């Protein structure tokens, strides 16, 4: 693994988007350099961990950031005065899980005692402090494990990150780049800011139809499986619906008027938003990208199947149809304050319809296909009564 400039560059762009630090245009930014170096130091420890046999640990512990083997998201919070606090952006040092894992794997217990008992105590002490292990295979099914996420309540964390994003977006502009840089390069910094919440969307979606579990063994007396509380799932859905709000997805006019076509030598790359408008910046595709990310994460085929089954086992739980109706509500009844936001709402509607159509046609579970098909037919009847406002979406339903 090479810890090169590309990794530093990514953290720089995240920080520049959030902080817009170049008010005068030529400021030095040692705080951003330290931000990026803190990530490199942590990543160095992460790779050493792999070298000595440690796997990724994505467990969301009440004890906080317990492992350098996690994929951490930079922690940026709001102060009371509206400023952003990045003093704890990345953790320093080795985590409690890392210490427990190395002790378990490498410690010599001197004194002729019972090594097995000593090893069990290492694990029990870790367990008692909520220092546990979940890895790559766990992140889609349970909100107990997530990549690039902070906190233990995914709904609250998504709302918090949307608040941070909103404040940073309200201040975003030419102060995100240095003097002499083409104004078009604001887009490079805009992308990670606009999508600041993207990984937390994945984490929050894992609450929906989520399953709590541990890798229990016979005789350990531990509860192996439980469903995520309906109240938590409903809060998660509320937070996810916020990410589809036209007012959250609309770019400020000041930003739209600041990004010209790219000059010679500054070609388009995959780090920029797609566009349908030729060389001109596209005001709608950022909303399309963000909305697609939310909707596609909520309506994965396996999550839809779990929603069907959890409603079957416990009618108080949100089911697939409940989630579909919330998405339709956001797509067709969400508040739009102007023609731009109306166009964004229509974009969200198109994203929702396309994803539900995909479930209706290709989901492996028969019940998912049936419920998705019925929901679309019911929606088509409602939209037919909304003519002409429902025309464009009715065409998608055909």
Regions found by a protein language model. Name each.
Residues 34-43, 59, 184, 188-191:
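Soluble non-cytosolic domains of exported or imported proteins
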Residues 48-62:
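Catalytic Zn2+-binding segment of zinc metalloproteases
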Residues 1-51, 76-78:
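Metzincin-family zinc-dependent endopeptidase catalytic domain
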Residues 2-4, 55, 59, 70-72:
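Generic beta-strand/beta-sheet core signal
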Residues 28, 39, 54, 87, ...:
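Sparse, context-dependent recognition of short Cys/His-centered cofactor- or disulfide-binding micro-motifs
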Residues 63-398:
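Conserved catalytic/binding loops enriched for acidic/polar residues
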